[in-house]
Design a protein with these regions (language model features):
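ASCE RecA-like P-loop NTPase motor cores
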Residues: 1-198
């Protein structure tokens, strides 16, 4: 980021003003004031707006709290897995409802790769019990020495989830947070619902 920000100062005029090369930074996720990792500390000069029809579509996005009392983050190690299983069981009807809408794929966000495995196992059992044909896939670390299959996808290959047969992706928050585009053949998000299991 520093190289990109300071590249215009490679050459300066007689007054010390940048003379190029010129740089345009385009990102929808580089304004995170206070973050040394993500923030580009330069003033925003322009904002690109989506087409009116896309803005209208996005305005229809619904956010809601499940009302479940289970909290995974902050729970003791001995309770965390039980809380995660309970939250997954309670979310099954909501997940099935989203799956049956056939609006797109579903993302479940968890706190770790271990939790992704736990949720996948719990959810697969619950889906079969409910006679739901949805299939799950969980993200695995790139460093894992095992091939990805239909029920796993490596972090570095997660963009291919859009083309996989699986309907539900389970991924850790820190692994999916930035730089991953899960899009259909038209460049639109392949995801229709996101559940935060945290």
């Amino acid at each position: 980021r520093s190289l990109m920000k300071d590249l215009p100062y490679l050459r300066t005029d007689q007054h010390g003003n940048p003379a190029g090369p010129h740089v345009i930074l385009l990102s929808g996720s580089s304004w995170a004031e206070g973050s040394y990792e993500y923030h580009v500390n330069r003033p925003v000069n322009y904002i690109l707006e989506a087409d009116a029809e896309k803005r209208v579509f996005l305005e229809k996005t619904r956010f809601f709290e499940s009302g479940f009392l289970e909290r995974i983050s902050g729970a003791g190690d001995d309770q965390r897995v039980a809380q995660l299983r309970a939250a997954t069981q309670k979310a099954v009807d909501l997940i099935i409802s989203e799956y049956e809408r056939k609006a797109g794929k579903i993302l479940l966000v968890v706190n770790s790769y271990a939790q992704a495995l736990e949720v996948q196992q719990t959810l697969e059992t619950a889906l079969r019990k409910a006679n739901c044909s949805a299939h799950t896939c969980r993200m695995i670390a790139d460093a894992i020495n095992a091939p990805s299959g239909e029920d796993t996808v490596r972090r570095g290959e997660v963009s291919r989830f859009a083309q996989m047969n699986a309907d539900i992706l389970i991924a850790p928050a820190m692994a999916i947070e930035r730089g991953h585009n899960i899009v259909d053949e038209y460049g639109h998000s392949a995801l229709s619902a996101v559940f935060f299991m945290v």
